[in-house]
Design a protein with these regions (language model features):
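Helix-centered, glycine/charged polyanion-binding patches within enzymatic domains
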Residues: 3-7, 11, 211-212, 217-293, ...
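An N-terminal domain-cap segment
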Residues: 34-54
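N-terminal core-binding DNA-recognition domain of tyrosine recombinases/integrases
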Residues: 46-48, 67-69, 108-109
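Alpha-helical support elements that line or immediately flank enzyme active sites
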Residues: 55-67
Length: 320
């Protein structure tokens, strides 16, 4: 699919939105993802022909990048020409409506294709040497959900729960991720209610081939849990209070321990990058749907796209 107006012509000033679309147009493996989804996409033997699969996939990706609901996406086709161009839609032809966009998402959810989208992207990155498997860093973040009962059901989402972070309480879910300790690319995503402790899912975030695992102090005791992997050496952060008590000035051993903690922290920092991309770059700060299943599937798609965004410069350079 060609979008001539999206090419990376550096002599022309582009908006951030145009730049994002131009770069992602080149780094997303469209052909591989279309091949993945095609067996589950209708051929349109009856009634009006369906929109091109790649167009619908591009629309689905734009929803993730710009936090657009199905209705907002439909309306954006008329307000924002670059969205039409990116999806390969004729400005004078028919546009996918809210229901069409919804049905495409439901098809992805029904067949759990978000898992395969993440796997397909990561296979591509691994083949190019961008995703290694020697170590995994783990972390979790809270994703807010509506706490109001002013809705159709007159109640909050029963699959979301409150969790305390510092002195504040948050209502929602948790996104747990395992990332490549070298590149920071996400390989495993698990969604739970907000009250599940980070350490509970820690060992489930391993892909099975790593020799080392890294986590913050919330993962203390992970190597003693029933699901611990014997082949993995865990490097968990010291609790903040204990580290503050180190006498780095007068005790050489304490000074050495503090240096080790700094090294562990520098490796753990890689796990913050994907969270920053989906929250700040893509604007994902709260759940879009009710229930854990749909929101977890969306998270897997978001992290697949964040992986591509994080290594876009390497991918573009490799293309020449």
């Amino acid at each position: 699919m060609k979008q001539s107006s999206l090419d990376l012509n550096l002599s022309t000033k582009k908006t951030r939105k145009q730049e994002l679309l131009a770069q992602m147009d080149r780094v997303v493996p469209w052909a591989a993802l279309v091949e993945l989804i095609a067996p589950y996409y209708p051929e349109g033997k009856n009634g009006r022909p369906p929109f091109a699969l790649e167009s619908m996939l591009r629309i689905h990706c734009m929803q993730q990048w710009f936090t657009l609901s199905d209705l907002a996406m439909e309306e954006a086709f008329f307000d924002t020409p670059i969205y039409r161009e990116f999806a390969g839609l004729d400005a004078h032809g028919r546009m996918p409506d809210e229901s069409t966009i919804l049905r495409f998402r439901h098809r992805l959810e029904k067949h759990k294709l978000a898992d395969q989208i993440l796997a397909t992207v990561n296979d591509l990155l691994a083949a190019q040497g961008l995703l290694l498997k020697a170590g995994t860093a783990v972390d979790a973040t809270l994703i807010a959900a509506p706490s109001s009962t002013k809705n159709k059901d007159k109640k909050r989402d029963p699959e979301m729960h409150s969790s305390q972070k510092g002195n504040e309480w948050h209502f929602g879910m948790k996104a747990h991720i395992g990332v490549d300790a070298d590149s920071g690319l996400v390989h495993t995503v698990i969604g739970t209610s907000g009250n599940v402790a980070d350490v509970v899912e820690g060992n489930s975030l391993l892909h099975g081939q790593e020799t080392d695992g890294f986590g913050d102090a919330g993962y203390q005791g992970i190597d003693k849990r029933p699901d611990a992997k014997e082949a993995v050496r865990w490097h968990i952060a010291m609790r903040p209070g204990k580290r503050r008590a180190l006498d780095k000035e007068n005790n050489p051993v304490d000074a050495l321990i503090d240096q080790v903690e700094k090294i562990k922290a520098s490796i753990r920092a890689k796990v913050e990058h994907p969270f920053r991309v989906i929250k700040r770059q893509f604007g994902y700060t709260k759940v879009r749907y009710r229930g854990l299943k749909k929101n977890t599937l969306q998270l897997k798609t978001l992290f697949a796209l964040s992986n591509l965004w994080m290594v876009r410069h390497q991918l573009l350079e490799a293309q020449g």
